[in-house]
A protein has these predicted regions:
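Zn-dependent metallo-beta-lactamase
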Residues: 2-5, 17-55
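Bacterial N-terminal signal peptides
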Residues: 9-16
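Active-site-proximal beta-strand elements of phosphoester/diester hydrolases
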Residues: 41-44, 58-62, 134-140
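Divalent metal-coordination and catalytic microenvironments
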Residues: 52, 83, 135
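Active-site metal-binding motif and surrounding structural segment of the metallo-beta-lactamase
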Residues: 65-110
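Portal/gating segments that form or line small-molecule/metal binding sites
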Residues: 94, 99, 103-139
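Conserved small/polar residues in nucleotide/adenosyl-binding loops
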Residues: 141-146
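Hydrophobic alpha-helical segments, chiefly the membrane-spanning helices
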Residues: 152-154
Length: 154
């Protein structure tokens, strides 16, 4: 009888644990209709980390590994890093989102951290890294012209 109870307990525990699945994280999103009628979806992860998806294109801004499991998300066409603070630049998140075709746009300091394989901008610069996107680097309160920190205005 003692072995029967132990056996039943083991089966019940196995069934209970096997029924637990890891639920995928959900994040707030907002979908907008652009002037040309296409849908643009913005997903907010946390702090300054967000994603923009439109017409199958994926743009990530300030991805930080603590805020999302970027390896499970669609790969990036473009990654924008606004400046080199720890809560805006995470090389592991950039690597998780990148492919050989991914373009990373950032300031000079962030580019050095990422190994220099980026398009760099400083306040006042404009750049069109893709035919569907134009970026203007603006000097904001977290910016310091001497350090070439930027904020990206889409």
């Amino acid at each position: 009888m003692k072995h029967s109870k132990l056996f039943i307990f083991a089966i019940m525990t196995t069934l209970a644990v096997s029924g637990c699945k890891h639920q995928a994280a959900t994040y707030p999103t907002d979908t907008l209709t652009t002037k040309n009628g296409s849908q643009l979806t913005i997903t907010f992860f946390k702090h300054a980390s967000l994603a923009i998806e439109t017409e199958g294109r994926h743009i990530y801004i300030d991805p930080i590994s603590q805020y999302a499991d970027y390896a499970s998300l669609p790969k990036a066409d473009l990654i924008l890093i606004t400046h080199s603070h720890y809560d805006h630049l995470d090389s592991a998140a950039v690597a998780a989102l990148s492919t050989a075709a991914t373009t990373v746009v950032c300031d000079r300091t962030s580019s050095e951290t990422l190994g220099g394989k980026c398009l760099t901008m400083k306040p006042g610069d404009t750049l069109a890294p893709r035919d569907y996107l134009s970026i203007e680097a603006c000097l904001l309160y977290t910016s310091d012209a001497a350090n070439d920190r930027i904020s990206v205005d889409l």
